[in-house]
Every structure is written in C-alpha cells, then in structure tokens.
Swiss-Prot record:
GO terms for cellular component: ribonucleoprotein complex; ribosome. The gene is rpmE2-2. This is Large ribosomal subunit protein bL31B-2. PANTHER family: 50S RIBOSOMAL PROTEIN L31, CHLOROPLASTIC, LARGE RIBOSOMAL SUBUNIT PROTEIN BL31C. It comes from the Bacteria. Belongs to the bacterial ribosomal protein bL31 family. Type B subfamily. HAMAP family: Ribosomal_bL31_2.
Length: 84
C-alpha cells in the first residue's frame, strides 16, 4: 500500500440524533466536533440522521402507506387483474 494517499482509519463516534444513541466504531470520517466516550477518551463525533437503531427496516416498524388511494386509483384506471 502506498504511503500518504490513504485517509486515516481511526475510532469515531457516530451519534444517531433521531434515537439519541451513539456507538463507537472505526472509520475514515473526520469531524471538527469531539465527544468524551465512556472509556474516558475523546473521539471525533459524526451526527447522523438515521442508523440501524432508528431506521424502520431494522426496527420492524416499517409501514406501507397508500397515500391518496393510489393503488385503488390504479386499479380503477387499469382494472384489477387476477393471476400471478
């Protein structure tokens, strides 16, 4: 591996703002902001809007929303077909 061309891979805290949850992992992300972690060390912190803690797919709260009856409108327009 060539020296000097790769970003630094280091511990970083990712903070999920929606779920008020933070986790420490390794990444090449950088940040001006820092946070003191449970082990007493200071790490860069990256705020994220969605993580595995708050995403509906991972939490099991996913819902299918039929906004404005689009499925019914489609079926009226093109007819509901039986089959596969």
């Amino acid at each position: 591996m060539r020296k000097g061309i790769h970003p630094e891979y280091r511990p970083v805290v990712f903070r999920d703002r929606a779920a008020d949850y933070a986790f420490l992992t390794r990444s090449t992300m950088t940040s001006e902001r820092t946070v003191e972690w449970e082990d007493g060390r200071t790490y860069p912190v990256v705020d994220v809007e969605v993580s595995h803690v708050s995403h509906p797919f991972y939490t099991g709260t996913a819902r299918v929303l039929d906004t404005a009856g689009r499925v019914e409108r489609f079926e009226r327009r093109y007819g509901k077909q039986d089959g596969a």
